[in-house]
């Protein structure tokens, strides 16, 4: 069961948070999670995207994002990227007004405005935790359905 949302692809309505996920994130990061599933309704949902879906360049409202890549043998370039604006070098929302690097709605999908800072390859069952306030996007989408496309579980949270 998936729903319409602000992202691309299909996303589950239900949150799937397995035992000790929050505690494991806290242990890995050495921080206490202060806002989790109760605050962020998309924490713990599954999502997939397929070839032809545009990449969306964005920052999150949440402090941290995490994703677990769930497609076996996926192309490595189909992971997630932290990017910087080519014109002004901004790669994090703390460096200026987000409207300076997203001046018009159509620039959210215009990859020519950005260059890669960090690339997290799509490795099956790998969890990547990153600063949600950094400008980021998916790598390449691939496949034609949930069985052959880019599948991941995502988490959003704040911590101190």
Give a label for each model feature:
Residues 49-160:
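Catalytic core of non-heme Fe(II) oxygenases with the double-stranded beta-helix
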């Amino acid at each position: 069961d998936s729903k319409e949302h602000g992202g691309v692809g299909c996303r589950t309505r239900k949150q799937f948070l397995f035992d000790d996920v929050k505690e494991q994130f806290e242990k890995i990061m050495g921080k206490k999670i202060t806002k989790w599933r109760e605050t962020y309704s998309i924490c713990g949902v599954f999502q997939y995207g397929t070839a032809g879906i545009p990449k969306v360049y964005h920052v999150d409202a949440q402090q941290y994002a995490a994703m677990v890549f769930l497609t076996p043998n996926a192309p490595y370039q189909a992971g997630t990227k932290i990017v910087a604006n080519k014109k002004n070098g901004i790669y994090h929302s703390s460096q200026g007004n987000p409207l300076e690097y997203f001046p018009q709605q159509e620039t959210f999908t215009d990859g020519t405005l950005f260059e890669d800072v960090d690339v997290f390859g799509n490795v099956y069952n790998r969890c990547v935790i990153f600063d949600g306030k950094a400008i980021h996007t998916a790598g390449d989408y691939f496949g034609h359905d949930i069985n052959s496309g880019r599948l991941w579980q995502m988490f959003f949270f704040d911590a101190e």
